[in-house]
Amino acid sequence: MRSHSLSPGAHGDAEVLALLERRRTAGRGAGAHADDHRLALVVGGGGMRGAYAGGMVHALEAAGLAGCFDEVWGSSAGAFVGTALVLGHGADASRIFCDDMASREFIDPRRCGTRRPMVSLDHLLDHILVESKPTDWSSLVTSPVPLHVLVTRASDLSAHVLTGLPDGHAWKSAMRATAAIPLLAGPPVRIGDDDWIDGSVSDPLPVARALRGGATHVLALMTRTVDELVATPADARAPLWARSLDRLAPGLGRMAQDASRHGECLSLLTDAAHPDRAGAHLLTLAPHTSAGVRGLTTDPGRVAAASRIGHETVDGALGLPAAA
């Protein structure tokens, strides 16, 4: 790793990469780092755009860096990808989008307007993550690296964090909640005394939340290129599904459009003197180019390309040679 230079797709403070390198060299493993730093991995959401982040997490794991983080934060698809890093399933995170999720069983626009959601979380949680890419949610209970899952309270659209849950059932419910969008991906999920929906509605990239939680270093994985974020006008006309959500709950449709929500945190991501950073070291990795993947893309070729681009972006940041 080179602390003096950042590759395309990497933006911010190379000290984050330097800390990763020092911890890997020390070899102490997750939860046993001897320095005084607190290194958070923050993974953005975005539906099928999560393929970019899946490739990034696979690259981090392949480089021996998965155990270097003190905590992982994620919203929606980012929470699922973050889970893969915590549990050592980086390869699955890279392949699940093109192998399993780019399908009509998971996303089928023909279900729009029926009683069945266009996006089937049942298929994801009860088939894909059981049969194809098995995930033991109970392993999160004893993980030395805590997972923080963002959810949105349905009643007031406020962001909340679910972490330190007692068992696998609770974790599975949290994962359903962080991806649930009424009319699109299923009804709100009841946890405790509240109903919860997709975490990216209120906080698609919880960098500020990780900083407020005490992180001294943050590596944020983006699922849009910088150009895609900057090019999204704040007054862009909302798609039909988002306007339908606004009729269900005023403001829900606008908040569910992750491009506009990401745009609101660009100043935090790009301004080293931003008051919310409080001297912390922050590095973002965004796809170095676009594969043309959107939130509901089901073209396996494009989705596989997004995973490959994510892997290449991390390899470039780490100074590793491009894969043949």
What are these regions, as identified by a protein language model?
Residues G74, G78:
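Gly/Ala-rich beta-loop-alpha elbow adjacent to hydrolase catalytic centers
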Residues M1-W73, T83-A324:
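Patatin-like phospholipase
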